[in-house]
């Protein structure tokens, strides 16, 4: 079976017909092999040589695998890229733009199980012909990207290699195809990368984030742009800038053009639940990358810290990206679903849920090297909804919440105490008749999948300024995808 995705083709591996007397056993083996091939794991065919031959590529590309298997030892494993667009051990593409296909196949051999190798094939007269085999730089493949970095009209192949299964320590290699075979141009360490025209000259560059864990007392990190240098026929560092090194992994890179500036938003995790966004751009005045939110004195980026797994996005539908930032909400207390479900109280007969403080989420735009607030929200991660609130409510309301119900109270900041109940938001399974009866006197906020979200406003809430329109027009379940 062939699936077309743009210009790229991905292939599913399909098993041979099993013998009748091993019907059920072989069916189980085939299911396991398919699951493993999709999960980014290597699958060692020789373990099942006595039962069935290696699964075959289907259709016109079956000859590619036949040719490949004649070149390698019988005992081999296919190695599938773990991330990115290309998620098959067999990648077929017109890399050199000559209107005929080429292919690369990632694999490991029994004698060198910690080294991924790859074969390069060209297609001639409808058949794939092997060109050469190459040693990779790591124990598995992180991802594969393509880009015309040297402007010769042909794509270079960028392969990211994992070094001993580390989340941050990797190396990418750039291979040129113009001579008819693959030539290694350059390789550099990285933790996360993307293809971006960093300085706006019309030529793609490699933009990479890298964490250096060799420093004994703290990690350091940097954003680096690599560009092709015609004099040396290799990649050279265009510019590099320091970033927060106290991160556990990178999540995503997003590029936004504002006026004549390309803003690069780098999402990073700090531990299990905290995130930051680095904002990096090319400064034409100094011809270099800059990271204005990075605090040199503390070696951290704290201005975009939030205590939840939430990435930047266009929250107000104005066509531009906003960054979420956590702001303390005094007096708040909600059930902590990331903690153990219950704790024993002083009385052994009772148990209570662990709780945690809630935060307002401030959505900010990056303009003129500063962050400007454009929206405030209260976010229920477990309930899967976002409630945008007027900025005048910040510091004046707080939340007490259990699973399925959040109560919004007036916060008396002068006395630092809980005030009157203003409104409540509940959610429940719309197919549960008992709960539907319980909430029959509430008003509907939204329905998402099998969940109904409802609300009630108290007289004190109406006096405070809470209205039906404020709640219904600012309630959103699509950002988080509804109840978890």
Model-derived features: where do they sit?
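Secondary-structure transition/turn motif
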Residues: 268-269, 326-328, 409-416, 457-462
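Short, Lys/Arg-enriched N-terminal segments with co-localized hydrophobic residues
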Residues: 1-18
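Surface-exposed amphipathic alpha-helical segments
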Residues: 455-484
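Sec-dependent N-terminal signal peptides of Gram-positive bacterial secreted proteins and lipoproteins
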Residues: 19-46
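Generic recognition of long tandem-repeat/solenoid scaffolds
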Residues: 206, 264, 387, 404-413, ...
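Extracytosolic low-complexity repeat regions of secreted or lipid-anchored proteins
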Residues: 331-334, 435-466
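Beta-propeller-forming repeat regions
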Residues: 38-398, 446-448, 481-484
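Secretory pathway targeting signatures of secreted, lumenal, and periplasmic proteins
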Residues: 392-440, 444-445
């Amino acid at each position: 079976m062939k699936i077309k995705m743009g210009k790229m083709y991905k292939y599913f591996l399909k098993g041979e017909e099993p013998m009748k007397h091993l019907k059920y056993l072989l069916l189980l083996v085939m299911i396991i092999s398919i699951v493993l091939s999709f999960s980014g794991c290597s699958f060692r065919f020789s373990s099942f040589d006595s039962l069935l031959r290696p699964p075959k590529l289907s259709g016109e590309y079956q000859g590619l695998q036949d040719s490949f298997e004649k070149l390698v030892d019988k005992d081999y494993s296919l190695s599938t890229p773990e991330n990115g667009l290309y998620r098959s051990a067999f990648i077929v593409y017109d890399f050199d733009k000559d209107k005929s296909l080429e292919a690369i196949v990632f694999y490991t051999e029994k004698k060198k199980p910690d080294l991924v190798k790859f074969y390069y094939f060209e297609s001639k007269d409808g058949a794939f012909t092997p060109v050469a085999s190459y040693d990779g730089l790591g124990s598995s493949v992180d991802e594969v990207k393509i880009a015309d970095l040297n402007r010769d009209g042909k794509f270079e192949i960028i392969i990211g290699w994992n070094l001993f299964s580390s989340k941050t320590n990797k190396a990418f290699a750039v291979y040129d195809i113009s001579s008819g075979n693959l030539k290694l141009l350059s390789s550099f360490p990285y933790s996360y990368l993307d293809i971006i025209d960093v300085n706006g000259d019309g030529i793609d560059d490699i933009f990479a984030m890298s964490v250096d864990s060799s420093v004994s007392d703290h990690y350091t990190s940097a954003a680096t742009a690599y560009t092709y240098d015609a004099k040396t026929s290799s990649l050279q560092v265009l510019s590099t800038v320091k970033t927060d090194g106290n991160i556990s992994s990178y999540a995503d890179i997003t590029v936004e053009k504002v006026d004549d500036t390309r803003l690069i938003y780098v999402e990073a995790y700090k531990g299990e639940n905290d995130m930051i966004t680095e904002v990096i751009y090319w400064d034409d005045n100094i011809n270099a990358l800059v990271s204005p939110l990075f605090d040199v004195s503390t070696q951290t980026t704290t201005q975009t810290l939030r205590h939840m797994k939430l990435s930047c996005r266009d929250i107000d539908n104005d066509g531009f990206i906003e960054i979420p930032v956590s702001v303390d909400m005094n007096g708040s207390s909600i059930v902590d679903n990331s903690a153990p479900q219950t704790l024993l109280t002083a009385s052994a007969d009772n148990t209570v849920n662990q709780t945690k403080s809630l935060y307002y989420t401030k959505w900010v735009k990056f303009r003129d090297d500063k962050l400007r607030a454009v929206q405030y929200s209260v976010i229920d991660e477990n309930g899967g909804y976002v409630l945008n609130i007027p900025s005048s409510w910040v510091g004046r309301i707080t939340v007490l919440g259990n699973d399925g119900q959040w109560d919004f109270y007036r916060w008396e900041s002068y006395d630092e105490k809980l005030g009157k109940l203003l409104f409540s938001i509940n959610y429940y399974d719309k197919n549960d008749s008992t709960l539907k009866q319980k909430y029959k006197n509430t008003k509907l906020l939204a329905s998402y999948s099998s969940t109904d979200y409802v609300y009630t406003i108290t007289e004190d809430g109406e006096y405070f300024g809470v209205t039906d329109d404020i709640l219904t027009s600012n309630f959103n379940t699509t950002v988080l995808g509804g109840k978890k």
